[in-house]
Amino acid sequence: DNAKAAKIYNEMISDKNCSIFLTLAGSTSAGGCMKLYSDLVKYNMVDAIVATGASIIDMDFFEALGFKHYQGSQFQDDTELRKNYIDRIYDTYIDEEELQACDQTICDVANSLEPKAYTSREFIKELGKFLKDNAKKKGSLIETAFDNNVPIFCPAFTDSSAGFGLVMHQEQNPNKHITIDSIRELRELTEIKVKSKQSGLLMVGGGVPKNFVQDTVVCADLIGKKVDMHKYAIQITVADTSCLLYTSPSP
């Protein structure tokens, strides 16, 4: 399966008419894979990214601020972890106070922007601009994408520290604040698909990012734009084979 996936990905990269979408879900970023994703951007191996808010904010942006994830145990008592202000992603630990500092940074960036509607792509681009001057750890996916003009979309953006930070921002600015326009975001991603002669998907995990990028074909059809289905697809997952809508396709 790995050899077959590598062959398909080589075909994507060799196809000059193909736009490559990378989708990220799950905890591979906290597990140490973010440098790999940054390299895909750096070496022009992907054209757009669709990710969960957790992957982009709670893992990538969080570490760019100088914070870390720690190897722990999946068997640790959660009540004890809570007493010590430690959050857990299976066997990976996060300092809750550091996460709240990340929330506050999101709030601060939002406070600095013109109060209007932004797509997650536009807001993440502002985070990339912020990291250019303020990152404690260079080479994050957000900053690398900013440097290489690769858009990052997070359709479930508020399901992360971004959500907490933006709630704080709106609480502090009840009459004039920013909002996230998820409808325009779908339109933006669909336009990338429409303008692409061919497209390929490199999907890590499933969930919202996988569904969102696949929905671009349907969305294009509904607004009267004729597009082909995605020509290439690779999904890296531990899920069992089942209905395509909900889990992984058959090899």
What positions do the PLM features span?
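Metallocofactor- and cofactor-centric catalytic cores in central/energy metabolism, strongly enriched
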Residues: 1-66, 72-80, 84, 88, ...
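Short active-site-adjacent structural elements
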Residues: 59, 210-214, 241-245
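Ligand-binding beta-strand-loop-alpha-helix segment within the catalytic cores
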Residues: 80-162
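Short, flexible loop segments at boundaries between secondary-structure elements
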Residues: 228-245
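Conserved small/polar residues in nucleotide/adenosyl-binding loops
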Residues: 246-251
